[in-house]
Amino acid sequence: MDQVRAKKALGQHFLTDLNIARKICASLSGGTFEAPAAVLEVGCGMGVLTQFLLQRCDVVVYGAEIDAESVEYLHGHYPDFAPRLIEGDFLKMDLRGRFGSGVRVIGNFPYNISSQIFFKIIENRDLVPECVGMVQREVAVRIAEPPGSREYGILSVLLQAWYDIEYLFTVGEKVFNPPPKVKSAVVRLRRNGVRSLDCDEQLFVKVVKASFGQRRKMLRNSLRAVFGDFGAEHRFFPMRAEQLSVADFVELTQWVADNMPDGDIPRG
């Protein structure tokens, strides 16, 4: 019982359905037999997904696992994999130092840090061409939704700026131990062709966050709360944040940059 509580505290719900594990594994593209792609599994647990990844000849599998009990289990059951298993926190990992030539990411992501995992992927978008992750269903819906949806939000915009996102399939509660209280879903992110935005990218993040900070209000009011009064109007001001596409937010960011006095643009 204490071990189960510990897993819950880590946000971990271990997948027990082998067919779903195979399906998740097959959803990730790889390299070739001659040039296998590096793949990092985040949260290997007891190796339910790991075992199928290790069967592929087009990938070299690495793992990130923070739970000492799981690490010990994996060392005992997959000794050939053990040298590539990193005991530690994925969120603190130096991906560039370890995978300078790029790495695909996959995993049954702990619910309590799934959004943080996606933010880390955004930060390392030049290194991560693809990600397949199982997350809480509401998170999967949120990041895959187009503009105009109530679920569309900050993470939706920031991920869709750099990745094409597919909601692959829903996963029920009974295939986990311990069973979560919500449904899960698997999503796939594939790097799009955007290499840079036509605006200040740090300011873009600030504008997106400010816009959704009071998402029920018109953008005029949401932005004013962070940037102050511009003394001018933009055509998006009567709209709400959820109505704007990534391209719209790029346009709005450039307008904010052009209409703020030099040195007054918040960067934090």
Regions found by a protein language model. Give the residues of each.
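Catalytic cores of RNA-modifying enzymes
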Residues: M1-A210, A247-W255, D262-G268
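Conserved Class I S-adenosyl-L-methionine
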Residues: P179-K181, R216-K217, N221, F227-G268
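A short, ordered amphipathic alpha-helix with a cationic face
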Residues: N192-R195, L223, F227
